């Protein structure tokens, strides 16, 4: 599954249980990027995607399949890091107050930056989107060679 998170320049996601920002053109870009794949989210995020078919569930991260995308606006993703194999990290490039932050330290633990996109926004001039993939674990340390 691929998680999609929108963060301000210090990693903030929410402030007093409200998103720190939003952008209509970024939503359009996300939907073009994922194509025909399913996009899961909780009820709170549904209004952002009113023009698109999305799947709604409070346990959306548990229900999403391996090829699905999840729009994440809470801290519950940390419980599903073993299931998440990709991230689209959308950076607002502005500072907004926040009290829930994305844990950037997880990216140093087996993740690789695959691509960076510049997205022209409606309320933000440019939004940087980083595409991260989880590196596959190498089992070479455990393999036995023939003698």
Annotate the PLM regions.
Residues 1-147:
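Enzymes that bind and transform nitrogen-containing heteroaromatic metabolites
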